[in-house]
Amino acid sequence: MKKRDKMKMMGILILLLAVITVAITLILVSRLSKTAGKDQKEETFDRSVSGMLSNAYILKSEEKDIIVLYRGETYFAEGKPEKKYTGVADIELTKGKVTKIYAKPSTIKGVLTSYSSKSVQIEGYEPLSAEKDLPVYLVASSGHAKIPVRQGKISDLVVGNSKVELVVAEQKACALVSYQEDMAEKVRVLLKNGKENTYASLFVCSGDAYTVDGNKRKKDTVTDAEKLLKGEKTGKEIKISPDTGGLLYRCDENGNPYGSGYEGDLILRKEKKGYVLINEIPMEDYIRYVLPSEMPLSFSYEALKAQAVCARTFTYGQMKNDTYARYGANLDDSIAYQAYHATTSYEVTDQAVADTTGMVMTYKGKLADCYYYSTSPGYSENLEVWNAASPGYLLAENHTREKTKDLSSDKAFHKFITAKADAYDENSPYFRWTATLSAKLGMDETYGKLKKLKVNKRSTSGYVLSLTMVFEKGERTIEKENEIRYALGKYLLDLDLADGTNKHRASSVPSACFEIKSQKKGTIVLTGGGFGHGIGMSQYGADAMGKEGKKWQEILGFYFKDVTFTNVFDLDT
């Protein structure tokens, strides 16, 4: 055979092999695509593997076709199932083949009300101890989903909202299966007892008739948590519901209310250290009360609408936060989340919420992380102040006419903070401020008396990222924005604001955007600007933009780059 013919024959063979390879690949892909997706791998069980797989999910078991989801991976297995079965099961393997399927059909159905690393609770039931690393299976609501079942985490579920099946064996939670992927319509707010999460005693009353776990109570009747929950196990909940239009109050044992009442239901929950009080309320009603708690009624109407969208976006973003999952709550009523003063609703804020019902901010199809604060010094900040990576929609930008882009040097920051600025926030009393610190106001337990401060590092927005406090007996370096503000607050004697007002002994300096003006004889003077962390939407800035005629979408688009606005129920969860 000539060399040319040999080369031709070799080319044909290579082409034929390529075609065969592509064909085989297409066959495998077509088979795998029914259960596999980008986030789940496809495997076959190794022939050397024998033993038991606990709490796996059987996707399919017909004749010799067995498909198993286990620890996030999809396996195609050989075997002869006794009958068709889909769901959670223990699987016996012998040399890589399925030899027995032990179905686990025993389930508790209901709403997930609480969870921790050791237990899970379904509404109406006591908490059950849970398997370590409890598997959670999320079943798609559509039968045409590319991934019909995927393995998730329990934090993918929403306390007080997610409808689940808890798989139980030998009085222990083995797995959770969720069939619902809708966005939450209710929020559970833990009502704190000052800085504590629990109450030693707890009384509830109402000016109207109400029900306690379905049992009618007359108006002005006092419900005592201790009497209801005495002898009950930890985690036991009692739901108190008002009659239509009624409010529920926390009160003393004689029925004298503490503050204003709450819409929605109050849930009394027994814990080891006392009782937890939770307000379960529809999402939009919660936003109605957050809005006037977070923004003055006198602010422009478009700013109020922007704040409503911010508050709603933030709340939905917190629904899967597991901080209070053990108590059966999504968040609390403190400023650590959002101020929630369930006092009085107002027509203007109610209307702002109604006009933006369900609207949230999204970025690339996902819910955006929404942050807001009182006053910008004229330069927005990103997550650098929290030592975290920033998403593309949160940028550090100069919002004054002075377009200096980098304020990380002391010289550039001094020029910025002392210049007359033209900014949206300039009418805020916190736009510029002077803080006077006195070493006489505090004594560090370890290092003694405060001597001086040193700024080690600034962000490009001018915010202090690293501050060293020099004491008589040593030094302490702080590198978190909030900790810097409150550490200095211990020594804060006077705070003089831009509108001429003075605040004596405030709890913290308004922001970490400051310079050290002077320090001598135990007195340190700071010059700064802004109030809050500086990330996201400035409320005073939003007010000014609204008064200029800008719509809420423009306001939010100014502070959050390239975001879109979507009804939360249209989101792909």
Identify what each model region corresponds to.
Residues K2-T573:
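Conserved, single-site charged/polar hotspot
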